[in-house]
From Swiss-Prot:
Organism: Nitrobacter hamburgensis (strain DSM 10229 / NCIMB 13809 / X14)
A GO term from the CC aspect: cytoplasm
Gene that this polypeptide is encoded by: hisA
UniProt entry keywords in alphabetical sequence: Amino-acid biosynthesis, Cytoplasm, Histidine biosynthesis, Isomerase
Full protein name: 1-(5-phosphoribosyl)-5-[(5-phosphoribosylamino)methylideneamino] imidazole-4-carboxamide isomerase
GO BP terms: L-histidine biosynthetic process; L-tryptophan biosynthetic process
Amino acid sequence: MILFPAIDLKDGQCVRLEQGDMARATVFNFDPAEQARAFASQGFEYLHVVDLDGAFAGRPVNADAVERMLKNVAMPVQLGGGIRDLKTVEAWLKKGITRVIIGTAAVRDPVLVKEAAKAFPGRVAVGLDARDGKVAVEGWAETSEVTALDIARRFEDAGIAAIIFTDIARDGLLKGLNLDATIALADSISIPVIASGGFASIADVKALLAPRAKKLAGAIAGRALYDGRLDPAEALALIRAARAAA
């Protein structure tokens, strides 16, 4: 199980939103590269980055901030937001991104996901963000009529590295992960699933390490890390201990 610290980018700054609402953004660091270095020094092994402006614009917007982070940390980085074509996928991977996350295009253009996964094995993930059970797109501004499971099943044999499943209703509110829905998704597909949205405390780490969550590949933590509700050292120690005992 991997715990991914999250850096969400808006106007070149590190922010957290509440329920994906750009009007409810809190700036936690004016320098995303500095925040990335802080997470690296705390012992995290994989960084999760989202270009929020890019998600709304449909193209990369905070590229400079992302590139500065890549120059400042050696750990792997997965990136989502505004990745809508094969050219953008290839460009980010060439710049040093370990894994790209395709969200809106996974709903609108599933062929793109399959082509990208074939061209770059193990380096393409799909982001499925659900509101009331239905997948939201365009930076969560629109809600589709399909479920996360419907979309995930389209990619069962496509070689997708992971599905990142976010419960929008919980995102940024520190209410705890929606493990019931996330585990149900993981149990229904063969693609590794990463939980996101609502990470609140060490209790979430313990729940992720429980037997019923054994199929989950990881989870993403944001606001809980920034406001001190989740101690990185304690969380990572629990994860290391679980790995050693496995």
